[in-house]
Amino acid sequence: MPLLRGRCPARRHYRRLALLGLQPAPRFAHSGPPRQRPLSAAEMAVGLVVFFTTFLTPAAYVLGNLKQFRRN
């Protein structure tokens, strides 16, 4: 087992990081307290509409003009 311990590529990688003085980054700490009130139904509906409109509008445009795209 001692030979295996010295040949582990992950261990060599961490040794290289230590030689460079790099440390793994700390996890992100939230900058503020959590939201105190839950989202209302209207806020959630607006968010979903904006989200789906953002992604589905370009797809609908491409599918609607597919014949033009095929000609080029």
From Swiss-Prot:
Pfam families: COX8. Residues 1-29 form a transit peptide. It comes from the Eukaryota. It is not yet known where COX8C is expressed. One of its GO terms (cellular component) is mitochondrion. The keyword Transcription regulation does not apply. The chain crosses the membrane at residues 41-64. Keywords: Membrane, Mitochondrion, Mitochondrion inner membrane, Transit peptide, Transmembrane, Transmembrane helix. The keyword Transit peptide applies. Pathway: Energy metabolism; oxidative phosphorylation. Residues 30-40 are mitochondrial matrix. It is found in: Mitochondrion inner membrane. InterPro entries: Cyt_c_oxidase_su8, Cyt_c_oxidase_su8_sf. Component of the cytochrome c oxidase, the last enzyme in the mitochondrial electron transport chain which drives oxidative phosphorylation. The respiratory chain contains 3 multisubunit complexes succinate dehydrogenase (complex II, CII), ubiquinol-cytochrome c oxidoreductase (cytochrome b-c1 complex, complex III, CIII) and cytochrome c oxidase (complex IV, CIV), that cooperate to transfer electrons derived from NADH and succinate to molecular oxygen, creating an electrochemical gradient over the inner membrane that drives transmembrane transport and the ATP synthase. Belongs to the cytochrome c oxidase VIII family. Component of the cytochrome c oxidase (complex IV, CIV), a multisubunit enzyme composed of 14 subunits. The complex is composed of a catalytic core of 3 subunits MT-CO1, MT-CO2 and MT-CO3, encoded in the mitochondrial DNA, and 11 supernumerary subunits COX4I1 (or COX4I2), COX5A, COX5B, COX6A1 (or COX6A2), COX6B1 (or COX6B2), COX6C, COX7A2 (or COX7A1), COX7B, COX7C, COX8A and NDUFA4, which are encoded in the nuclear genome. This is Cytochrome c oxidase subunit 8C, mitochondrial. It comes from Homo sapiens (Human). The lineage of its organism: Eukaryota, Metazoa, Chordata, Craniata, Vertebrata. The gene is COX8C.
